[in-house]
Amino acid sequence: DYDPQAEGRARAARAEGSGLSSAEQRWLLDSLEAQADLAEFTPAHRTVVVAADGAGEFAAEFARVLNLPLFAEPSSEARHGATSIPHYPQLLADGSFAPAAQIERVVLFGHPTLSRPITALLEREDIQCAFYAPRRASWYEPGARSFVELSTPHELAEFACASSAAADELVDELSWLEQWVEPARELQDECLGAIAAYEHPGAESSVDYTDYRNRTAGRSYARRVWQDAVAQRRLMVLGSSNLVRDLDAAAPALGESAPARVFANRGLAGIDGTIATAIGVSLSGYYPAGVDENSRPVIGGAALPVTLLCGDLTFQHDVSSLNLPNTELLPELRVEV
């Protein structure tokens, strides 16, 4: 049987070697205190966690510890979270899905640009939103949205939950989470069934997969590339194409494995320089290792294995980046179009 406390201890033991900040590590590593905090932070609000582009590992850990539904974009680095909800855009856009209308608070990690339902959620006037901003650049300016900006995990937990002594009506956190998990599993099963029918068509199949409105082929392709990256321990770079939305719909969630790192130029350069970005990610495995006896620089390390997933237009827009001279370091790059 699944033991959330045992899982929490195991994850906390691995936190020290992760990319979490010292404050985030302290919040997770002190497992006993974290579990004791949960007795105080009994949810009195129907809170969800949005992990957008660049959100980071802590978004998944935060949602897991507090048993909150997690809406994680493919490039959030939180898609693998135990509470990551597949097909969250579809659930949010479904006017008949009651839990979507019942959301009271949102904790936001990262930069949301991928999903219109997420944008609509963050613009709702009946919802309080908090943005996690532990490290701010010197040029940082808050946006126009009326978000509460918080910099510590403890503040986030206080925002997402409330003291049981002060709450008039408590929310059963497992019940709130399950209200999202079960419908999401049904949509996931439906999606996987459509993919299986596409990949292994029967004689009676009459579905027109050439219809641009039918994204089954794209979802099948994106899911396979994602799973290959997981199995081969490759990093991923995602182009700003329909395929990234196909991946958002078809990529595994609810605790299933994800690639070690997933990058995207969301909200930065569109399709400009996507292949160059993937090359740069791969070349980041090299590092200067001093000089030789002739005072020439020595390079250490090796190219990181990277898979780029993009559409045909994104590929054509930056194909010249593949014109690499043999006098330069070469990437370990696989391009899936």
Regions found by a protein language model. Give the residues of each.
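A short alpha/beta connector and helix-capping loop motif
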Residues: 319-337
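Terminal amphipathic helices with adjacent charged low-complexity linkers/tails
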Residues: 2-18, 129-174
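Active-site diphosphate/adenylate-binding microenvironment
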Residues: 181-303
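Glycine-rich, anion-gripping cofactor-binding loops and their flanking helix/strand elements
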Residues: 35-38, 48-145, 253-292, 296-302, ...
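Conserved acidic residues
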Residues: 47, 104-105, 234, 334
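Redox- and metal-dependent alpha/beta enzyme cores, enriched for Fe-S-associated oxidoreductases
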Residues: 51-83, 176-177, 181-182, 223, ...
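Active-site beta->alpha N-cap acidic-glycine motif
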Residues: 305, 311-313
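Conformationally flexible catalytic loops at phosphate/diphosphate-handling active centers
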Residues: 1-42
